[in-house]
């Protein structure tokens, strides 16, 4: 089971509208979602209980128990979850967790669904409403799944912990584990939304668009879930998106030092208290790290020369040269050191 990547911002609300209509047709029999208000009370209790139990195991750092209660495919490749439990145990231990109303997803059919889309709750003429949600999961085997989201508050940064659960016999077994901070560089989604709007008002659309993207990431506990709030932010981000940035799979060229750089991605990245901007570009070979460093540095300077507004919004710039094989070489320069 893979979690789907996000749709392009401009597409989301449009496909929601026709997907609502499509739900009335044959595909509704393949993918059905029940929100907490719609599901049987015993099912809701079971999902909430499983979420609390797995959170307690996570707080104790009991990866062995979590693995024991996982579905076979997850247990067979458990290293990622084990690492996530270890990384977040200190934040979970002694913290208070509140379970949000869960969701029940039913996928029917004889084989895995290449792209399963679940519409949960009530939708209006314009798409999502206050209590609705959409989940998009790739390669999902037929079965009953629960989504239990916990808000975790302790001495550290607020977090969410999301469990995807699969009904197996009398158990709701672990099928996915997603721990996520509710803040980036010490700020929550509301802070990034306000600053994005401020940048937009100053016609700094590159900063606005990148801050909207961070706000969207912080507004949903998992990337394969969207809500009315994230849909509205996608619309705002689309309105601010500049034409000269790589987005939606489209590369953009930037000239620096007589070389043409094919930029493939640009995105914000929080590292500790710093908030950086990362730019990736195509490279034939990164084995010569001295040359790669020089080219990364030249690109960083050219990027700031073209978009000086980035200095107002970020603590540093990361350039990553990426080979066709996926191997890359990155360089981070603090903003104050870039002349």
How does the language model describe each region?
Residues 30-60, 176-191:
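Short, low-complexity N-terminal intrinsically disordered segments enriched in polar/charged residues
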Residues 33-42, 48-49, 64-131, 216-246, ...:
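Short solvent-exposed beta->alpha transition segments
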Residues 5-19:
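Bacterial N-terminal signal peptides that target proteins for export
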Residues 144-187, 267-291, 298-338:
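Short beta-strand edge/turn micro-motifs at domain boundaries
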Residues 79, 85-156, 186, 244-287:
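Surface-exposed, charged secondary-structure patches
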